[in-house]
UniProtKB/Swiss-Prot annotation:
This is RNA-binding protein 42. InterPro entries: Nucleotide-bd_a/b_plait_sf, RBD_domain_sf, RBM42_RBP45_47-like, RBM42_RRM, RRM_dom. Pfam families: RRM_1 (PF00076). Transmembrane segments: none annotated. Residues 293-371 form the RRM domain. May bind RNA. Gene3D superfamilies: 3.30.70.330. One of its GO terms (cellular component) is cytoplasm. The keyword Methyltransferase does not apply. Its main location: nucleus. It comes from Xenopus laevis (African clawed frog).
């Protein structure tokens, strides 16, 4: 019984492989009314160890090669029908273009028969490999392709009905009418897109760079400019060189004399003051105009500053400036300041009207400023006059 069971298992395996090959190649499989022989599931673990790690990759390669061959053979047979290129074509494209490996046992619908649910399956690639360990009662293996190449399959494989169209891999629906046209639109669309891109590239990138350098080269006329420059140089070199040399020193000498003249009055603007037998230079007097009319403002409070003093005398039209004298170290006021006017009439009016008026918290006291009496020139002149009069 052990030997018979092994032979039956091998026949079942060969029948399943033959059916799978026929489905892949697209050959019709006639269902047989014979009921399948139920087999025990215990035979599965004996066959599974034969599958190796590279079984999936080998099966994928064989399926892709056969799918490509089937597509190339089926293509020219359906040249005449043009009606199938309509909108009904796109749905079947994915199964036709990408055949994927799915075991035959998983593709078939589940039925109440026990033979339909068994997971025993060996891919076609395992037939080419070296024979694995066998039982002593098993016969030698034979290529499974002989069943469908040389004659009809054995009677044991006819009891398996073909799977539905939805569960089959890519190649089986090749004989169907609407499936062969899909490769055509893809082949026709590709050449249409490529030439358009190739033709657009040269027109966009080649035309502008060729025109720009030509325009740039043509525009600048270099030859006439060189001739003109040479002609100007020839005309200028002769008579112009001796004429320019004598003119330059004359122009340079004039500003030197002006600078000397300007330097003299700057030296005379020094304000030297003398008092109590000492003399010093007061630079603060240079801020005032020498020809103005100044008023001495005394008895000023600590809160009075330049702005308050200027606001008190700004109603006069010829008012120039007002300043409060402060201690350089502490910054406090010394209690007096000066106000200058350009018009002597305003000077007289301000002295009469503002004398004794409150500026800040105290009444202001005004009198004529005697800042010129402390100048060294004025002091020396007075000393000479006194000597002439014999006072000293």
């Amino acid at each position: 019984m052990a030997g018979k069971s092994g032979e039956e298992k091998m026949k079942e395996m060969e029948a399943e492989m033959a059916l799978f090959e026929q489905e892949v190649l697209g050959a019709p499989v006639a269902p047989s009314p014979v009921d399948p022989v139920p087999l025990s599931i215990q035979a599965v673990p004996i066959i599974r160890p034969v599958i190796a790690t590279n079984t999936y990759s080998q099966v994928q390669q064989s399926l892709q090669a056969r799918a490509a061959a089937a597509a190339s053979v089926v293509g020219p047979n359906f040249v005449s029908p043009v009606t199938f290129v309509g909108p009904a074509i796109p749905p079947p494209r994915p199964p036709v273009m990408r055949p994927s490996f799915i075991p035959h046992a998983l593709q078939r619908p589940i039925e109440p028969h026990g033979a339909m649910t068994r997971p025993s399956f060996i891919p076609h690639v395992l037939q080419h490999r070296a024979p694995g360990p066998r039982h002593p009662g098993m016969p030698p293996l034979q290529p499974l392709m002989a069943h469908h190449m040389h004659g009809p399959p054995p009677p044991l494989m006819r009891h398996i009905p073909p799977p539905p169209l939805g569960m089959r891999p890519g190649p089986p629906p090749a004989p169907m009418g609407p499936l062969p046209p899909p490769p055509r639109p893809m082949v026709q669309s590709a050449p249409k897109i490529n030439p358009t891109v190739i033709q657009a590239a040269p027109t966009v990138y080649t035309a502008p760079p060729v025109r720009k350098p030509e325009e740039e080269i043509v525009e600048p006329p270099i030859i006439p400019e060189e001739k003109e420059s040479l002609s100007y140089e020839e005309t200028v070199i002769g008579p112009s060189m001796p004429e320019i040399e004598p003119v330059q020193p004359e122009v340079v000498l004039e500003p030197v004399q002006e600078d000397k003249k300007k330097a003299k009055p700057e030296k005379l603007k020094r304000c030297i003051r003398t008092a109590a037998g000492t003399s010093w230079e007061d630079q603060s007097l240079l801020e005032w105009e020498p020809d103005d009319f100044r008023i001495f403002c005394g008895d000023l409070g600590n809160e009075v500053n330049d702005d308050i003093l200027a606001r008190a005398f700004s109603r006069y039209p010829s008012f120039l400036r007002a300043k409060v004298i402060r201690d350089k170290r502490t910054g406090k006021t010394k209690g007096y300041g000066f106000v200058s006017f350009k018009d002597p009439n305003d000077y007289v009016r301000a002295t009469r009207e503002m004398n004794g008026k409150y500026v800040g918290s105290r009444p202001i006291k005004l009198r004529k400023s005697q800042w010129k009496d402390r100048n060294i020139d004025v002091v020396r002149k007075k000393q000479r006059e006194k000597k002439k009069l014999g006072l000293r």
